[in-house]
Amino acid sequence: MIVIMDNGGQYVHRIWRTLRYLGVEAKIIPNTTPLEEIKAMKPKGIIFSGGPDINKTGNCSAILEHYDEFNVPILGICLGHQLIAKHFGGKVGRGEKAEYSLVEIEILDENDIFRGLPRKLRVWESHMDEVKELPPGFKLLARSETCPVEAMKHESLPIYGVQFHPEVAHTEHGADIYRNFAELCGEL
């Protein structure tokens, strides 16, 4: 099962629906769910959803602080991506302009979550803030003309972040990104 931490984003149910469409068991839980309850669920992966406020991400940071107790792949979407970057020492701030549109990203490293996908994708973005500077120990996976860190991966742990929303229908190959993540979790 993959646990989806609900950070109040407008697309959280689309994440769940995409995973279910792929045949993956998934469960949306409040981001305030205690760590012990999350551990008892024995998730094989965790997704941090998007949301409106980086200061209202509940126990997502605690999961990162206690990563060795979970030891499963983590994928941060939009706000979740920013939270991961901030937690590991990256810089998050306002973008040059708010993005509520399709953006073309360039995949620099096919890596795990982009395995088998084209080098350029049109993706849906819905954000004011963005990762301005990659955290130490992370590798840049994708960028765009408007955002320097569209996707990243921890160099030694299976922790990923994407600024865009793979779950939105406008994103090309969005379901494939979730399929690749589910495969990393051993769910497919």
Swiss-Prot record:
EC number per UniProt: 6.3.5.2
Q: Which residues form the Glutamine amidotransferase type-1 domain?
A: 1-188
Q: Which keywords accompany this UniProt record?
A: ATP-binding, Glutamine amidotransferase, GMP biosynthesis, Ligase, Nucleotide-binding, Purine biosynthesis
Q: Pathway it acts in? A: Purine metabolism; GMP biosynthesis; GMP from XMP (L-Gln route): step 1/1
Q: What class of enzyme is it?
A: ligase
Catalyzed reaction equations: XMP + L-glutamine + ATP + H2O = GMP + L-glutamate + AMP + diphosphate + 2 H(+)
Signal peptide range in chain numbering: none
Q: Name one GO molecular function term.
A: GMP synthase (glutamine-hydrolyzing) activity
Keyword Nucleotide-binding recorded: yes
**Where do the catalytic residues lie?**
C78, H165, E167
> HAMAP family, alphabetically?
GMP_synthase_A
- Quaternary arrangement and interactors, per the entry? Heterodimer composed of a glutamine amidotransferase subunit (A) and a GMP-binding subunit (B).
Q: What does this protein do?
A: Catalyzes the synthesis of GMP from XMP.
The protein, known as: GMP synthase [glutamine-hydrolyzing] subunit A
User: What's the source species for this entry?
Assistant: Thermococcus kodakarensis (strain ATCC BAA-918 / JCM 12380 / KOD1) (Pyrococcus kodakaraensis (strain KOD1))
| Organism phylogeny | Archaea, Methanobacteriati, Methanobacteriota, Thermococci, Thermococcales
